[in-house]
């Protein structure tokens, strides 16, 4: 799944939830928060343009995103972790 210059991250939310989608480098350092807020159930997507939280273009490498969705109603926690390869 190498990408350049941007990629779309698609996800499914089973219940109305508080959602965070955070991107980390291979060393585990937070690069950027892509989503942080309430989301309705269903399909969603977010575009990552290869930049960090300061808007600077990142170097080629492996990046990991972790999505956490905590249901507002049932308090269930849903998580998903994926790996992406960014090529300049």
Predicted regions and their residues:
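Glycine-centered coil/turn sites that cap beta-strands in beta-rich domains
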Residues: 2-25, 33, 45-48, 69-75
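Solvent-exposed serine/threonine-rich low-complexity stretches and specific carbohydrate-binding patches
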Residues: 31-40
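C-terminal tail/sorting-segment detector
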Residues: 10, 59-88
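A glycine-anchored, Pro-Gly-centered beta-turn/N-cap motif
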Residues: 40-44, 59-62
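Residue-level detector of conserved, well-ordered beta-strand and adjacent loop positions
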Residues: 35, 49, 85-87
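Short, hydrophobic beta-strand segments
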Residues: 48-54
């Amino acid at each position: 799944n190498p990408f350049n210059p941007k990629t779309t991250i698609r996800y499914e939310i089973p219940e109305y939830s508080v959602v965070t989608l955070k991107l980390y480098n291979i060393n585990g350092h937070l690069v950027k928060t892509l989503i942080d807020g309430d989301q309705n159930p269903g399909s969603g997507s977010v575009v990552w343009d290869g930049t960090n939280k300061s808007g600077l273009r990142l170097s080629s490498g492996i990046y990991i995103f972790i999505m956490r969705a905590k249901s507002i109603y049932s308090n269930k926690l849903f998580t998903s972790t994926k790996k992406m390869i960014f090529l300049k």
